[in-house]
């Protein structure tokens, strides 16, 4: 059975194509900076928004009528959903996918049913991967949707909820290992609070630290070679989440000695919810040595919530990709489309339209970012701007050659009177625009 009978395999047709089901910029094997586009971008389609979300929102029920979402036996529907997913991935020509445990298998009415259902579906996913060549970018566990997680998972006041979450993460990590996933993601959707009146912040932070230590220990026990990734988000669904942004996660990791074990998976829409630009969050993670992977999407600047729209700004994605290229590119991570079609985009073909357009945005952004790296005007300016720190005096300050008192004496003795120098922001914005709009 074909779930998308009206859609042929999406191919590269070039910039002059006007087909919404053809790539204008994503030429998978085209070499950029000595490496194929597909290897730079490592793009993935997510299971949850693409195949699980029914088109519901807080004010209305689902609008979609996907064949794998109809009423019926949950396991049979999960099997059909997997068939639809891999047909979609294959026709789209995307190399990776991502999932939560309960995206791919019904949770069932008991932990025993959960375990059995998930095990059966992992068997099927493994066969689909072998037959299609599609790979798993990352797996994760949904420890936020079930009512038992209303007060969190690892941060829950009930240790039995903590243990249940542990069972799910244990199962999802083992599945990710078996399916040769490149990363394992931990998103603390309800690891936070609604009110401080009933919350013990110190205790909940200690619980999270212990849980993450257990995850790290299990990674090494099973021999998982990929990255563990925390996905920062400031709020929603909770009022305040503990993994607020990359800098907050960095502090948490250092508190519990996990800074060499866990990195971050940065989502564009989460960055803006935290009051940051996507560019800022990537640059911050890179500077702190915890950059891992990307959830590619965008938010609506007029809405204060997570809209998870497909990325469509070449300017934004060029700057993001520039930072990633400068950092050496992805190691295990990639660009995962944590993006969903709009509630009024009812047709199955809309799933293709959203992904094709977004993949083209990333491909064009990669080319523009590569040009920026090859003729790195920004780095040249930064080198000049900070040149004083490469001189003997600057090097001595950084290496501990001065105390505060001797530094003050140096300033007094030499009657220092440094003057401000232009930061050339407008010039540099023009430089970036020339690369992007070539």
Swiss-Prot record:
The keyword Transmembrane helix does not apply. Binds 2 magnesium ions per subunit. Belongs to the xylose isomerase family. Its main location: cytoplasm. It catalyses: alpha-D-xylose = alpha-D-xylulofuranose. The gene is xylA. Homotetramer. This is Xylose isomerase. GO terms for molecular function: magnesium ion binding; xylose isomerase activity. Mg(2+) 2 binds at residues 267, 270, 306, 308. Its cofactor is Mg(2+). It is found in: Cytoplasm. SUPFAM superfamilies: Xylose isomerase-like. PROSITE patterns: XYLOSE_ISOMERASE. InterPro entries: Xyl_isomerase-like_sf, Xylose_isom_bac, Xylose_isomerase. Mg(2+) 1 binds at residues 231, 267, 295, 338. Keywords: Carbohydrate metabolism, Cytoplasm, Isomerase, Magnesium, Metal-binding, Xylose metabolism. GO terms for biological process: D-xylose metabolic process. Its EC number is 5.3.1.5. The active site is at residues 100, 103. GO terms for cellular component: cytoplasm.
